[in-house]
Amino acid sequence: RLFTHFDSKHLRLNFDTGNAFIAGNDPLEYLQRFRKYLSHAHVKDVSQELTAAARGEDTGIACSEVPLGGGVNAENIKRCVEYLKETDWSGVLSVECYGSDENIRKSIEFLRGLLV
């Protein structure tokens, strides 16, 4: 609703794959709806446990315990990244996962695989 009240190039969206999913949205549909406002994207996967506890709640999650590709949101992440590539988006993607060295390595590997 916010975007309907303001016509400004300065009002932008920071999209988050995990928060869109947890809130009960289809992340790709949500991204497509607001693509023209997108300035930044957080790429976050979500564990099965968190999904069971919070899916459909009007909330966001600060970070995730699972690496990208290791949770239930992996397919949505793939679809969103593919859409961003198809639409020639050139903004910033931020990986969001709690930082064990292994989680970070797996997340970067997963995202690199999608970006080629």
What are these regions (language model features)?
Residues 3-15, 20-116:
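Histidine-acidic metal/acid-base catalytic patches
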